[in-house]
Amino acid sequence: MIMTMMQTVRAWQQESDVEHRKQHKQRWRPDGAHISAAYDLNSDNDDGHHRVVHNQNNGSPNSSPNQSTSAFRQRQPHHPPTGQQPPRLPCTVTHFSAHWKTLLILLTLLSASTLTASANVTSTISPPINGSSTDYILLYGESTTSLVPALTTGLSGDGSGAVIEDEEDAEKASEYIFDRTDVRIIFITLYTLVFCCCFFGNLLVILVVTLSRRLRSITNFFLANLAFADFCVGLFCVMQNLSIYLIESWVFGEFLCRMYQFVHSLSYTASIFILVVICMERYFAIVHPITCKQILTAARLRMVIVTVWITSAVYSTPKFVFSKTIKNIHTQDGQEEEICVLDREMFNSKLLDMINFVLLYVMPLLVMTVLYSKIAIALWRSSRGLTPHVVQHQHQQPQQPSCQDIGMGMHNSMYHHHPHHHHHHHQHHQLQSAASSAGVVGVGLGGGGGGGPGPSLASGGSSTTSLSRKQSSKYEKRGVSITESQLDNCKVSLEADRPIVSACRKTSFYHHGHAHHQRAGNASVGGGSGGAGAGATHMSHSSSNVLRARRGVVRMLIIFVLTFALCNLPYHARKMWQYWSRSYRGDSNFNALLTPLTFLVTYFNSGVNPLLYAFLSRNFRKGMKELLLCSWKKGKGKSSSNSSMHHKRKALQTHSLPTDTTHIGNEQL
């Protein structure tokens, strides 16, 4: 097009030069005199003839006044020497007139070519309908709605802005990366795996926590809400996000488009907020157990969960308001295509994404890093004194452990609700005082009393002792009931609590067995030197388990923080690159693949949460196994459970000592 315009202008310039040479001619005579001639432009000389005015006065040209109005006369320069070429004529008004005409014609052609090129680009280049919603800008005219890509793919890749005229090049430039079969297979496989983790994994967590009586606690209540939020991510976000890139048109309607954007933001936001709440609950339960008992009651924790969901819903409301479906009629086959996008002209997209980056990534990551670091430091420091020598010294001079020391031993404090819990609260403290007077304290797990449920270890451990025959007959039934409650509490503990629970159970069984072998009839347990030596052996073994467990908790906390940071970083990094870097190209194949991959990694965090927070617990795995096998082992399991409880009660009443306390202590977890 530009070459055609240049050739046309050059032809017009040549015609103008010919016309100018016709109007101004200069003829030289052999004697050196010159003749100035001009064509008369009057209507009298339409035949093309011209008048020649001879000048004989020293060779200088002269024009008649009568002809000045009807003919154009050019004053000639002096006669040049013989043998030299005559000088060029200076530019005249006719030259300016011809140039102005040329400029006007050139400007007209340029404007016409610009309009034609823009019309061709608008009509021939259609946006990739399967692209991400972030790569579109919605332009609303007075009567029509057009959808234009943020970076037009119809331009050449060198950035020069030249329009692709070759049809073959245009087809290559408009080829969509997700139309390739291998790319489709890879993404369908990856999205299916993430969907299965999010859907089935979190659904299993919800069922196990809800149906298993042993897992009904406040901490698991948080995990169940986290699993529900991640379950919504798998149900409403994963496959819908994949469909944007694979199908040609949104077929679910405008309302479901709004609901998709709303639920996508709601579940993602609630999942992050619940992770922060779980982190805060663990911090108070481990580092400040007494404060946790006073502040984090069951009613308040339920209000916290309700507040999290309401806040997430309010925060996600703009996604419901600004979402809509857009019809694209500029397709090659003439069919209408519909996509679900956010109307980014109704709000500041950059500002909203920056707020999401701060509230949903930076602040949660900072809070979890600080609190989990404090938990790790507290557990690591408390593990320094857990050596056999120190434990033996503490056993020889027994003293009741503090709430903070016990709280540090439980990285996941559990909250329990027993029907007889508050009824036996007074007798529970009587037994504690009796055990303290006897000089022996077990590392038991007691339920919290008072105004609400509290941490099991933070409320003071219930001591397991053998009283005198007279006192034992009075509290025998209640004492057995409390011991069974302790065993149930031990079962609810998570994986990292196993060493301390083992110590609890070993100490309890040891004291009962030692009382059975004591034939002197004394009322206290472990008062003799033999009891101290045996107790030191058991406590030395349990202290090493506690040390390993606490260091394992530190490693697990690091995994929690790193998982959240790594899974959510790619999405926010891509957003920051899109807004703050000039090298970002939304039309490139790399970015076309990068966008769904960042979503996929974010969804993977919702799929891996149940693996980290639930499946690492042996107690949870037992509850899951019971849930899966309860259909055909229901009767057998019930009979075996009753028989086991009968033998357990008989063993406690007869004060018999099991032969392998380590096996029994670990079997319950």
From Swiss-Prot:
Extent of Basic residues compositional bias: 414-429
Protein name: Trissin receptor
Residue stretches of biased makeup (Polar residues): 1-15, 653-669
Species, as recorded: Drosophila melanogaster
Biased composition (Pro residues): 79-89
Record field: compositional bias (Low complexity): 55-74, 390-401, 455-470
Family: Belongs to the G-protein coupled receptor 1 family.
PROSITE patterns reported for this sequence: G_PROTEIN_RECEP_F1_1, G_PROTEIN_RECEP_F1_2
Residue ranges, Extracellular side: 1-184, 239-269, 324-350, 574-595
Keywords of the record: Cell membrane, Disulfide bond, G-protein coupled receptor, Glycoprotein, Membrane, Receptor, Transducer, Transmembrane, Transmembrane helix
Top-rank taxon, per record: Eukaryota
Disulfide pairings: 257-340
Keyword S-adenosyl-L-methionine: no
